[in-house]
């Protein structure tokens, strides 16, 4: 993964018209970083991250440790060899209203967390979705956002959701700090956040 060019902002595009949920991740130069596909009809969420558009070169697997729920831990491993990379977990009852995902490293040590900036924005975004015709149009001007923070509460990245009629676009912006988080884990936690928020009605 180290050979990939993680230049920011990174854009993740969630296609709305595919049968199985897919996310395409590109860097600021529009180079493909990851093609992501989530399996349908499984009790435990399972996602494969590929290096190519044709999905022939798997890079990572993301699997829930139990039947989907807010206590599930989504473990990230390398496709070759099964080496642990990290995990993403929604933190209990707090996540029912305001998104909060804890991200750990390969040794299960807390590394950073992802938190919704303003839950009312996402509430308005979901509300507009239910209004015929004008709702989806108005919702294109609503941009829910999330902050990636360290244990001290310092924000290092921002995830911003932008929508169109055929896709959801998530932009991962670096806020100019000097935190040395693994770029692969930051990108993979972005992907898992998109899928988890989709299940909660926020993506």
Enumerate the predicted regions with their spans.
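Intrinsically disordered, low-complexity proline/glycine-rich segments
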Residues: 1-203
């Amino acid at each position: 993964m180290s050979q990939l060019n993680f230049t920011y902002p990174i854009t993740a595009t969630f296609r709305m018209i595919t049968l199985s949920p897919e996310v395409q991740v590109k860097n600021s130069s529009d180079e493909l970083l990851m093609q992501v596909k989530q399996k349908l009809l499984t009790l435990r969420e399972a996602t494969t991250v590929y290096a190519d558009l044709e999905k022939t070169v798997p890079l990572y697997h993301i699997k829930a440790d139990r039947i989907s729920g807010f206590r599930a831990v989504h473990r990230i491993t390398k496709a070759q060899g099964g080496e642990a990379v990290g995990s993403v977990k929604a933190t209990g009852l707090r996540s029912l209203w305001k998104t909060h995902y804890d991200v750990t490293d390969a040794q299960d040590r807390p590394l950073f967390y992802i938190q919704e900036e303003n839950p009312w924005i996402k509430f308005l975004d979901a509300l507009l979705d239910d209004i015929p015709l004008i709702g989806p149009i108005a919702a294109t001007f609503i941009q829910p956002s999330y902050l990636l923070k360290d244990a001290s509460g310092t924000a290092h990245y921002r995830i911003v959701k932008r929508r169109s009629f055929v896709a959801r676009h998530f932009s991962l912006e670096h806020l100019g700090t000097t935190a040395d988080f693994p770029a692969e884990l930051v990108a993979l936690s972005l992907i898992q956040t998109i899928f988890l928020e989709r299940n909660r009605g926020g993506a």
